[in-house]
Amino acid sequence: MIDSIIRQRRTIKPAQMNGKVIPDDMISQLLELADWAPNHGRTEPWRFIVYAGDKMVSFCEEHAQLYKENTPAEKFKTTSYNNLVHASEGASHLVIAYMKRGANPNIPEMEEVAAVSAAIQNLLLGVAGHGLAGFWSTSGLVHNEVLKEYLGLQQEDKVLGIIYLGISDDPLKEGKRIIPMSEKVKWIK
C-alpha cells in the first residue's frame, strides 16, 4: 500500500484545487503524520503554522505585497506576484513549515533541515493517501528573512516551504522519472 501511495503522489497546484474545505480535524491528522518524521537526537525541529479561511486569503495577499516590496525590480515577476495573491483561491488550508533550531550544538543544522523535509514528505504522503491535493511551494519569500520577521520567527529558524492543501477534481497525471536508477545508484559488493 505505501509503495503505491509513494508512486502516485503528485504535486497539485492551488489553481487545480476546487475550493472545497477539508475539515480541520483531517488537517490535524495529517500534521500528526508529519510528527513521526525521523530526526537526530529527538529534537523534533518541525513547526507548522496553519492558515484557513479569511486568514489564509489575508496571508496570501500580504505575502504578495511583501514580495513586491522586497524584490529588486530586475528580479520581480508579475506572474509570481499574481500567483501569490491568488494562491488561496482553490486551497482549503495553507501550512507554513519551518525548522525551529534546537539548542544542541552537536546537531548540525543540515540534519534539522532534513528532519523537517521528512516531516513535510510525511504530510504529503498522508495527503496523497487520503486522495487530497497538496503543493509544497518554495516560491515568493520562503527563503527570505522578511518572511521570517513577518511570522515572528527567530533568526536561527528556517522556513522550508508553504504547503497548500485542498481537493482536486482533476485526474492525477502519470508520474515519470528522467534519470534511470542505474545512474543514481552505485553498488559496491
Residues covered by each model-derived region:
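Active-site-flanking beta-strand signature of metal-NTP-handling nucleotidyl enzymes
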Residues: L94-Y98, I163
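N-terminal amphipathic, basic helical "cap/leader" segment at the start of enzyme domains
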Residues: M1-G90, K189
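Short, electropositive alpha-helical surface patch
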Residues: L147-L160
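Beta-hairpin (beta-strand-turn-beta-strand) motif
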Residues: G53, Y98-G102
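Generic preference for hydrophobic
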Residues: F48-V50, V95, K184-V185
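C-terminal helix-cap and adjacent tail motif
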Residues: S4-K13, V159-K189
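Small-aliphatic-rich amphipathic alpha-helix that forms the alpha element of a beta-alpha
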Residues: A34, R101-E149
